């Protein structure tokens, strides 16, 4: 029997690795939700309702974490005792720092020129960069290169933030 303290992977009976069968995750999530959905406990006592709600909440949180590659990577690292240090470790390789500056300049220039096409192109570039880096992250995690994976997670977090900023600029210019 799985307990509330078990890992997200244990909850869904999946191996604790980055490479994930999304179809199996979806099916396992539906199975767990069917078992613990609060509606099944409508006639139960308050204690059973509360426990069902805890399990449903836990299943939702676990599913959201495992479904998102960046959250899944961060979670895997935390299970291995590796702190990604996103709040206090901003050191990154020089090539990535240069890329960051180029992206920032691209955002500023395109926003100043009110050039939505340039922002769309930058957003596409960021999505491609994220896809490539997520693949690399999976290789790092599944080979046990946890410190390199932690840096890759920090870089991906930055890329997601920049992509979000680009999306906000596009929305601002289109309204």
From Swiss-Prot:
Annotated InterPro entries: DnaJ_domain, HscB, HscB_C_sf, HscB_oligo_C, J_dom_sf
Gene Ontology molecular function: any one: ATPase activator activity
Key words, A-Z: Chaperone
PANTHER family: IRON-SULFUR CLUSTER CO-CHAPERONE PROTEIN HSCB (PTHR14021:SF15)
HAMAP family: HscB (MF_00682)
Subunit structure: Interacts with HscA and stimulates its ATPase activity.
Name used for this protein in its record: Co-chaperone protein HscB homolog
Organism for this UniProt entry: Burkholderia cenocepacia (strain ATCC BAA-245 / DSM 16553 / LMG 16656 / NCTC 13227 / J2315 / CF5610)
The organism's taxonomic lineage, starting at the top: Bacteria, Pseudomonadati, Pseudomonadota, Betaproteobacteria, Burkholderiales
Protein encoded by which gene: hscB
């Amino acid at each position: 029997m799985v307990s509330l303290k078990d890992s997200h992977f244990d909850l869904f009976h999946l191996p604790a690795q980055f490479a994930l069968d999304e179809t199996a995750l979806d099916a396992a999530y539906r199975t767990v939700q069917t078992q613990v959905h609060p509606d099944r406990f409508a006639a139960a006592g308050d204690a059973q309702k509360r426990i069902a709600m805890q399990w449903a909440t836990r299943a939702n949180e676990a599913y959201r974490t495992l479904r998102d590659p960046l959250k899944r990577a961060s979670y895997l690292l935390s299970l291995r005792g590796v702190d990604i240090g996103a709040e206090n470790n901003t050191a990154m390789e020089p090539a990535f720092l240069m890329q960051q500056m180029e992206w920032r300049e691209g955002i500023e220039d395109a926003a100043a020129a009110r050039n939505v096409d340039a922002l769309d192109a930058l957003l596409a570039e960021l999505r491609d960069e994220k896809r490539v880096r997520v693949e690399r992250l999976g290789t790092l995690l599944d080979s046990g290169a946890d410190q390199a994976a932690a840096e890759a997670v920090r870089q991906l977090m930055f890329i997601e933030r920049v992509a979000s900023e680009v999306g906000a600029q596009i929305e601002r210019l289109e309204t």
